């Protein structure tokens, strides 16, 4: 266990700035209680029990600033393993900023982004993977993304990585003993075959973990989804239904959407970054033409394409062009306006399609099911499974797996065990970067700088 390190006392507003019922100003450090007491009138905070909430007032000398509730949590049973004080104030920018400035004038330092979580990491409260999951939980756009983050915060990924690293370390230790003390008869010899069996087992464990990466990354980051189609086929109506609110202008006038509209929607637990593109057509309108070019770019960059066709009209040359343009993408063809008589010839469409009415919100559940089928083979989230979702973690597991494969190839070619040790050690070190056991200081600083202030 890492011993708590000595730091100065930091302060920051931990709730979003703006109007609200309450706001929280947080202190952490050796002098947290002393600094809070210097601006607080109520019970003596040095004498109250830990993990209690205490009523009082904040004063600037004799001037009342706010009526507050003050939470006192003593080390080491806190998030940072330091003394923590949280001042619950009335929401609003003026009051919270004034209280923060009072704390800073009385000895606290303004916290850097993510510094509270960084202290939790440095003091051994959480490891690096758990620290990153804190931000993933804050940024989660769906319940399934939040579930993955909570499991990682609880240590599911860390436990798996630590177990694999421990097994690798034991194998490396046995190799070292054989190299350094070959004359000892009572030490089991690690033969090439024995090491190959062990590294093959480690390789399988990492392969299994890596197989969750696609699902995890989608749930964490979302699917970039382009809604395409010629003008006035119902793209904006579809966007509004998926968002469950009116974000795009819906009219009968072609060219109403003159740019690219981007919003996030929760579709069955999958975050979709929906891009409602300008209708792709020839136009003399300069602004609309720019929107059309951006639409084509969005199509090229999309993870998923929703191609909207007007089922109440016959297919046009532009419809056929879009069908051809998107044929190699992860595409769902939507025959919209099924509330009107159908005139579209379905024989002109290759592959599956779904009939919907975006105007009346009919059959959109089938779109959700199709997305699930395309990207998750029908199972979005495996129960109790450890899932890789962070791009940094995925990259490190890929590199660790590559090192193991090189070790296995060397063993298969008959290379000495001591030469193979280099690749196995590299695998062990790479996995250690996930939890922070082997992460360089520069990486740790860079990761925590991405956190929000007050966390």
Swiss-Prot record:
Signal peptide feature range: none
Cofactor(s) in the UniProt record: K(+)
Residues involved in K(+) binding: 232, 251, 253, 256
EC assignment: 3.6.-.-
Cofactor note: Binds 1 potassium ion per subunit.
Positions of GTP binding: 232-237, 251-257, 276-279
Gene Ontology MF term list: GTP binding; GTPase activity; metal ion binding
Binding site for (6S)-5-formyl-5,6,7,8-tetrahydrofolate: 26, 86, 125, 455
Gene3D superfamilies registered for this protein in UniProt: P-loop containing nucleotide triphosphate hydrolases, Probable tRNA modification gtpase trme, domain 1, tRNA modification GTPase MnmE domain 2
Compartments, as annotated in UniProt: Cytoplasm
Main location: cytoplasm
Record GO cellular component, one term: cytosol
Record: residues binding Mg(2+): 236, 257
Residue ranges of every copy of the TrmE-type G domain listed in the record: 222-376
Spans through the membrane: none
Gene Ontology BP term (one): tRNA wobble uridine modification
PANTHER family with a match to the protein in the record: TRNA MODIFICATION GTPASE GTPBP3 (PTHR42714), TRNA MODIFICATION GTPASE GTPBP3, MITOCHONDRIAL (PTHR42714:SF2)
Subunit structure, as described in the record: Homodimer. Heterotetramer of two MnmE and two MnmG subunits.
Family, per entry: Belongs to the TRAFAC class TrmE-Era-EngA-EngB-Septin-like GTPase superfamily. TrmE GTPase family.
Record's protein name: tRNA modification GTPase MnmE
Organism: Lactococcus lactis subsp. cremoris (strain SK11)
Organism classification: Bacteria, Bacillati, Bacillota, Bacilli, Lactobacillales
């Amino acid at each position: 266990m890492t011993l708590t390190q000595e730091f100065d006392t930091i302060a920051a507003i931990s709730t979003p700035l703006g109007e609200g019922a309450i706001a929280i100003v947080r202190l952490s450090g050796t002098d947290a209680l002393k600094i809070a007491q210097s601006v607080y009138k109520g019970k003596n905070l040095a004498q109250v029990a830990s993990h209690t909430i205490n009523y009082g007032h904040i004063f600037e000398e004799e001037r009342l600033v706010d009526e507050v509730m003050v939470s006192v949590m003593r080390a080491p049973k806190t998030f940072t393993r330091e003394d923590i004080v949280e001042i619950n104030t009335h929401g609003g920018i003026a009051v919270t900023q004034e209280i923060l400035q009072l704390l800073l004038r009385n000895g606290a330092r303004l916290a850097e982004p993510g510094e509270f979580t960084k202290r939790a990491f440095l003091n051994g409260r959480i490891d690096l993977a758990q620290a990153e999951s804190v931000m993933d939980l804050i940024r989660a756009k769906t319940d399934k993304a939040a579930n993955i983050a909570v499991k990682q915060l609880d240590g599911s990924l860390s436990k798996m990585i630590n177990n694999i690293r421990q097994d690798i370390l034991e194998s490396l230790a046995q190799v070292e003993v054989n190299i350094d003390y070959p004359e000892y008869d009572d030490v089991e010899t690690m033969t090439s075959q024995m090491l190959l069996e062990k590294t093959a087992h480690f390789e399988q464990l990492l392969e299994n973990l890596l197989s969750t990466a696609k699902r995890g990354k989608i749930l964490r980051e979302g699917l970039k989804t382009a809604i395409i189609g010629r003008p006035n086929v119902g793209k904006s109506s579809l966007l509004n239904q998926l968002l469950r609110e009116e974000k795009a202008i819906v009219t009968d006038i072609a060219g109403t959407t003159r740019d690219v509209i981007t919003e996030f929607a929760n579709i069955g637990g999958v975050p979709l970054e929906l891009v409602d593109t300008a209708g792709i057509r020839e136009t003399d309108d300069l602004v609309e033409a720019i929107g059309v070019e951006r639409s084509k770019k969005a199509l090229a960059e999309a993870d998923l394409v929703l191609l909207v066709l007007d089922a109440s009209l016959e297919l046009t040359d532009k419809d056929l062009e879009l069908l051809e343009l998107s044929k190699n993408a992860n595409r769902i063809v939507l025959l919209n306006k099924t509330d009107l008589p159908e005139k579209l010839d379905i024989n002109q469409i290759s592959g599956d399609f779904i009939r919907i009415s975006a105007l009346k919100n009919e059959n959109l559940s089938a779109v959700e099911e199709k997305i699930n089928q395309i990207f998750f083979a029908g199972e979005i989230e495996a129960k109790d499974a450890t899932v890789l979702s962070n791009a940094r973690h995925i990259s490190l597991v890929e590199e660790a797996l590559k090192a193991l494969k090189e070790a296995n190839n060397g063993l298969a070619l008959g290379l000495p065990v001591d030469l193979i040790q280099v690749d196995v050690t590299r695998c062990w070190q790479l996995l250690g970067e996930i939890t922070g056991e082997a992460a360089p200081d520069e990486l740790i600083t860079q990761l925590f700088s991405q956190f929000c202030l007050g966390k």
